[in-house]
Amino acid sequence: MAKGQSLQDPFLNALRRERVPVSIYLVNGIKLQGQIESFDQFVILLKNTVSQMVYKHAISTVVPSRPVSHHSSNTSVGASVGNYHSGGVSAPAAQQESDGTE
């Protein structure tokens, strides 16, 4: 489990420390926006006009409003990690591939 947290924790911590506004896309397509107030192994506390506890298992994508630097040996994180999309690519748009007609 520690290996899985080696990218997630520094990334979320950098977003929290720098108070970077984020868009969080849930697996059902809902978009939440705010700043990460805190997080643990299972939840992220997202603050906007109110604080919301968002369970990580419900999150598809976390999109920062600007690039952040975090302590990781891999600097091209956006190109290799499925839970991070740079450039504002939204998860719902990427889900629809075809309508099944030929």
Swiss-Prot record:
Residues 65-102 are annotated as: Disordered. GO terms for cellular component: cytosol. It comes from the Bacteria. CDD domains: Hfq. One of its GO terms (biological process) is regulation of RNA stability. Residues 9-68 form the Sm domain. The keyword rRNA processing does not apply. InterPro entries: Hfq, LSM_dom_sf, Sm. Pfam families: Hfq (PF17209). Residues 93-102 have a biased composition (Polar residues). Keywords: RNA-binding, Stress response. One of its GO terms (molecular function) is RNA binding. Belongs to the Hfq family. HAMAP family: Hfq. RNA chaperone that binds small regulatory RNA (sRNAs) and mRNAs to facilitate mRNA translational regulation in response to envelope stress, environmental stress and changes in metabolite concentrations. Also binds with high specificity to tRNAs. Homohexamer. PANTHER family: RNA-BINDING PROTEIN HFQ. This is RNA-binding protein Hfq. It comes from Photorhabdus laumondii subsp. laumondii (strain DSM 15139 / CIP 105565 / TT01). The gene is hfq.
